[in-house]
From Swiss-Prot:
It is found in: Host endoplasmic reticulum membrane. The chain crosses the membrane at residues 29-46. The keyword Cell membrane does not apply. This is RNA-binding P34 protein. It comes from Lettuce infectious yellows virus (isolate United States/92) (LIYV).
Length: 292
């Protein structure tokens, strides 16, 4: 399990601080400060650190953040990106390098080219409110952060084994990589601040994006949700999902022929559906085994 690093703790505090600044803007908060903090702190390097447990000196990066120095922050990111490129031990780092490329520009290969970085150029030339700039940076950051389709969950070995914490996260009864729970909680916060949507809608959106990273921890294991999709595709099945009793007793039923799956969760429809899929998969496998 990955321990919470000083960098991660600082990140969470800065994200909270930035959200406060967006809500209560002051003249002392420069445009680049808001955009820089949201873009880099809610998206960037700490994601890589948490995903792979990669040890790296981040003191210069932290110092540049504390001083609100965008140029030094970019220099540190360039240096860290170059170091990550040299490490082949963690396949997930390829994904991390891609994140940094998105943040600092693909053509940014030398420190003396920093002034050409699109982030700096936009912040220097744009003349609009800091709230708008901050929110746009957050949207870009969330887009990069949530684009996790290339991240291979098989390389994420850090599982959340604390049953109490696992149940609190409502990820059904399956192991959850520690990084997923961290991302889940953080992203709910920043997305809620940015959109003002109902918190339940925000939770559902985040869960849908991160669900594929939930797995049992055994090599080659597929979550029941993934297995459900595979079974339906391979066997050309079109199960019927019945929601009509969810508002009364929290139950959702999935039917396909004589195979039925039922899930119950009175507070979260998504989790009731997932449990119904899990039971459907179990019953479908049992039926096929009996027919062999």
């Amino acid at each position: 399990m990955i321990m919470m690093s000083p960098l991660y703790a600082l990140t969470k505090q800065c994200v909270i601080d930035t959200a406060y600044r967006l809500a209560v803007p002051t003249q002392h908060c420069a445009i680049y400060t808001v955009a820089c903090r949201i873009l880099f702190l809610s998206v960037g390097f700490m994601t890589i650190v948490k995903l792979c447990g990669f040890k790296m000196d981040t003191s210069s990066f932290i110092a540049s953040i504390e001083k609100d120095n965008l140029m030094d922050c970019l220099i540190s990111l360039v240096e860290m990106r170059d170091r990550l490129r040299l490490c082949n031990d963690f396949p997930i780092l390829n994904y991390g390098v891609n994140i940094l490329e998105l943040l600092i520009g693909k053509r940014l290969n030398k420190i003396n080219n920093l002034k050409n970085c699109y982030v700096i150029r936009e912040l220097i030339t744009i003349n609009i409110s800091k709230e708008w700039v901050g929110k746009q940076a957050l949207k870009v950051g969330l887009h990069c952060f949530l684009n996790l389709s290339q991240a291979d969950s098989r390389h994420v070995k850090y599982l959340l084994s604390d049953k109490e914490s696992l149940n609190k996260m409502n990820f059904s009864r399956y192991y959850v990589p520690k990084v997923v729970t961290d991302l889940y909680l953080d992203l709910i916060g920043v997305l809620y601040v940015n959109t003002g949507y109902n918190i339940d809608l925000v939770e559902k959106f985040i869960f849908d994006k991160l669900e594929f990273l939930v797995y049992d921890g055994e090599e080659g294991f597929k979550s029941p949700q993934v297995e459900y999709n595979d079974i339906c595709t391979v066997n050309n099945l079109k199960p019927i999902i019945k929601y009509n009793r969810w508002h009364t007793d929290g139950s959702i039923v999935i039917e396909c022929g004589d195979v039925i799956g039922k899930g119950i969760n009175k507070t979260k429809k998504k989790f009731a559906i997932n449990d119904a899929k899990a039971e459907f998969v179990k019953n479908f496998k049992a039926k096929n085994k009996n027919n062999e």
